[in-house]
Amino acid sequence: MTTDTTVFVSGATGFIALHIMNDLLKAGYTVIGSGRSQEKNDGLLKKFNNNPKLSMEIVEDIAAPNAFDEVFKKHGKEIKIVLHTASPFHFETTNFEKDLLTPAVNGTKSILEAIKKYAADTVEKVIVTSSTAALVTPTDMNKGDLVITEESWNKDTWDSCQANAVAAYCGSKKFAEKTAWEFLKENKSSVKFTLSTINPGFVFGPQMFADSLKHGINTSSGIVSELIHSKVGGEFYNYCGPFIDVRDVSKAHLVAIEKPECTGQRLVLSEGLFCCQEIVDILNEEFPQLKGKIATGEPATGPSFLEKNSCKFDNSKTKKLLGFQFYNLKDCIVDTAAQMLEVQNEA
């Protein structure tokens, strides 16, 4: 790709998207982002020092019919790459269909329809930010003998994934991603773009802008924050699963743009498994100001817990395609927590 290429990033104010936009601008791309309001968009432009290669458009509700039409009517002839990062990720709902499933599917559908209507000849690549949640059924997550690969799919149906908020979130990622692959299959003759998906596990790592921590944080980072604020002798839920650093997620999007071998691939981002016990161990070992003030759980039992209680992820195909080393858990958690503590001290 030449660096005069224009990239559209949906959900531009999100945790992952801010890192992606920073990396795109550093690489010389022209970037158009979408945010929900003028206020959010203005705030974002200011954070990037009103970079002349960055502009923002308003998409109030990604689930609304024709949500992205205006953006592509206006910029369709400039945009060559589309990174669809916008998707609901929260568990504070009981109407799973309305708040998680439908918006995720409709958002994907509406951005692809807008490309077909207004940018069928110009958009060359679409990269959808999916999740490992699209690969594994939540009830299988604790099966120690199960191995998940780039070919795996979450087996939940539209109905069965509405059992609880976690299953519904995982279902929303599966059905949004399926929508993208099916759209391309059905519209091959009327669009020219190729499709890839990026499927990260739990995404940790520092915020692009530290002050984002003052306005609520993404769900994965919330796990680290809770453990930083845990009590001595306190119990914590030992979440476990695949993890990745946000800086690697961002880098993977850029590699997917630039490397033809990534076309048509599902890129599974995981640098191994984590559990909260391992995070607590890192916090106690690396931050003297926390030692003796937060929970300790059962130190050093993380690996044996994971062996028994988590399915395994084999993403060797992805690692070979991407060709770069991911952050390990210790560095990722240290950088995440250090930023949180710094912001806390300034408050």
From Swiss-Prot:
**Record field: temperature dependence:** Optimum temperature is 25 degrees Celsius.
Query: What is its subcellular localisation?
Result: Cytoplasm; Nucleus
Its keywords, alphabetically, are: Cytoplasm, NADP, Nucleus, Oxidoreductase
Classify the main location.
cytoplasm
Needed co-factor(s): NADPH
Name the domain of life this protein comes from: Eukaryota
Briefly describe its induction: By furfural and 5-hydroxymethylfurfural (HMF).
Q: Name one GO cellular component term.
A: cytoplasm
Classification via InterPro entries: Epimerase_deHydtase (IPR001509), NAD(P)-bd_dom_sf (IPR036291), NAD(P)_dehydrat-like (IPR050425)
Chain residues that bind NADP(+): 40, 169
Q: What is its EC number?
A: 1.1.1.-
Q: Name one GO molecular function term.
A: oxidoreductase activity, acting on the CH-OH group of donors, NAD or NADP as acceptor
Q: Which residues form a coiled coil?
A: none
pH behavior is given as:
Optimum pH is 7.0.
The UniProt entry, under PANTHER family, shows: NAD DEPENDENT EPIMERASE/DEHYDRATASE, STEROL-4-ALPHA-CARBOXYLATE 3-DEHYDROGENASE, DECARBOXYLATING
Q: Which family does it belong to?
A: Belongs to the NAD(P)-dependent epimerase/dehydratase family. Dihydroflavonol-4-reductase subfamily.
Q: What is this protein's function per UniProt?
A: NADPH-dependent aldehyde reductase involved in the detoxification of aldehyde inhibitors derived from lignocellulosic biomass conversion. Reduces commonly detected inhibitors in biomass conversion hydrolysates such as furfural, 5-hydroxymethylfurfural (HMF), cinnamic aldehyde, benzaldehyde, phenylacetaldehyde, and anisaldehyde.
Descriptive protein name: NADPH-dependent aldehyde reductase ARI1
Q: Which organism is it from?
A: Saccharomyces cerevisiae (strain ATCC 204508 / S288c) (Baker's yeast)
Q: Which gene encodes it?
A: ARI1
